[in-house]
Amino acid sequence: AAATTTTRPGLAFSQDGRNWARFEGEHHTGAVFDRGEDGAWDARGVRDPKVLLAGPRDIRVYYASIDARTGKSAVGLALTADGFAYSKRGSEAIFGPGPSGSFDDAGVAAPCVVRLGRDEFIMFYEAYSSSAPGVASVAVATSRDGVSWTRPSAPALEAGAAGAWDQGGVGKPYAVPMAGDRIRLYYEGRAAAGDERGAGVGVALSTDADRFVFARRTSD
């Protein structure tokens, strides 16, 4: 039963953004790379893949998996020079849950990595805390190489106030760098913790004072 529900990343091409053709990867399922072997941290599957074009012949796929050994989600990295043949970087996750008592001690997921400069990578990710089961927030980690990360001390965007459309949590971040060193953050908002049914899409903008502090954009 486990094999039938395992998720793996695929690849598709399009010339117009509307009509797509699947690329058949080397794995027997057609996936471009596989989950980890039994006992590996990502043995349960590959979820939420996001591609970063980091440089010439430097294409990176950041992904999440629930670590079979801990039951907590972590972030991994696969590398490719041509977009077709992939290899995982190392045998462990590159970014895992925070220490006990932190805002992300129950798991990290849905990574979205953006390169802002030669030596500056930022990763937006979905964070879970053991103190609020199922309620996700969005946090931002920083790195000089896109592999070793500095964890923030607090989330950049938290669940909405009681009664808000996103009171159940915010996640699935997608960041777009804007002019003036600001960042536009699209995210999934949930009405109930851990329940994506009826989820919607929200947008927040970084503030002038701090590009890692975000304010929701509300309808006029």
Language model: regions and residue ranges:
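Carbohydrate-active catalytic/glycan-binding domains of CAZyme proteins
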Residues: 1-220
